[in-house]
Amino acid sequence: MNIRPLHDRVIVKRLEEERKTASGIVIPDTAAEKPDQGEIIAVGKGKAGEDGKIRTLEVKVGDKVLFGKYAGQAVKIKGEEFLVMREEDIMGVIEG
């Protein structure tokens, strides 16, 4: 990937959800909701605080995260879709 986020922004690749129900019914793309989980692909250097010092981000590359349904700006890079969002749009890190 050839994109480097600036400041407190991160690049997230959505994690694909199961397209089949427990009973075996296949959910078409048009009816499926977009997943609200993703993996951090790249992180910016951080945001300057009021004192002028850069506050590094809490998330790191490889973290699995939760975010809001409408968080981020979708971008396509080499045919793959990613989200660019601010760290504050991330609700939590999935651990374990």
Swiss-Prot record:
One of its GO terms (biological process) is chaperone cofactor-dependent protein refolding. It is found in: Cytoplasm. InterPro entries: Chaperonin_GroES (IPR020818), Chaperonin_GroES_sf (IPR037124), Chaprnonin_Cpn10_CS (IPR018369), GroES-like_sf (IPR011032). Keywords: Chaperone, Cytoplasm. GO terms for molecular function: ATP binding; metal ion binding; protein folding chaperone; protein-folding chaperone binding; unfolded protein binding. Its main location: cytoplasm. GO terms for cellular component: cytoplasm. HAMAP family: CH10. Belongs to the GroES chaperonin family. Together with the chaperonin GroEL, plays an essential role in assisting protein folding. The GroEL-GroES system forms a nano-cage that allows encapsulation of the non-native substrate proteins and provides a physical environment optimized to promote and accelerate protein folding. GroES binds to the apical surface of the GroEL ring, thereby capping the opening of the GroEL channel. Heptamer of 7 subunits arranged in a ring. Interacts with the chaperonin GroEL. This is Co-chaperonin GroES. The gene is groES.
